[in-house]
């Protein structure tokens, strides 16, 4: 309605010809339609699955909590956050990671001397903290201090005030984690070009919006990267984009953004073959029309365990956006309800 009033005013005052305004409406409508196909609107928080909460000892001043902070996260956001937390949870012990530290070793040492392990950093730092918490049978408190904070958003501890409330009230829940070759991930894992796709898309989102960012990122990745042969359930496919989710993501298609249920015990495997120009055109058209699930280049598999072989040689695996080692087989499994995290009733 607002756009219509603006268009009318521009025509009435003579600032634009009616044909210019009409063309603008058509172009805007087309972009909106494409955007809804590429990145469907987020569902209302009330539609997410209810998550069970357990109660542990309240810690109103942070008693027994050890917080490991990555001060370099998100241009110093970690350091700024820890300063504020000292006032809210004055009895909490704080450990800062230095550039020379082995993050996993710091987490393990902190967990060995804590009743609650807390972490302030990006998804990679949180991943290391989660493994230490599981190894020492401790609850984990996640303070969002990274760039995107995917896991903190998923468990409902964004912004940080929610984590503070959960610690003070003693409310926790259990969530799934997943492993690729016995290395943990909390959100996603991938091989091939998917990590590049996410990096480009998220870099552009704030400047050109999510729909166009997804389109540009997809085209760049499709044009530059070679496919990787993958064998799953005895069938070999050429994969240009391969996504693995800890839990089932929504929406369907190749722009997964969020999870409704963090306790479903499932892996979400999505494979897209855009290794040839013809395949890229078919995939792009399917994305624009919302028909990606119907084209032969796209495949989805949900299972608690998967084995993915790379018959043509090793590729580099990424976990939660951090690029790791070269592998020629991915043994992936879900560990259902393996991690206890502080969270509030609201899941989003």
Language-model features: where?
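Membrane-embedded catalytic cores of phosphoryl/pyrophosphoryl-handling enzymes
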Residues: 1-54
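Catalytic core of DAGKc-family lipid kinases
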Residues: 78, 97, 134-240, 246
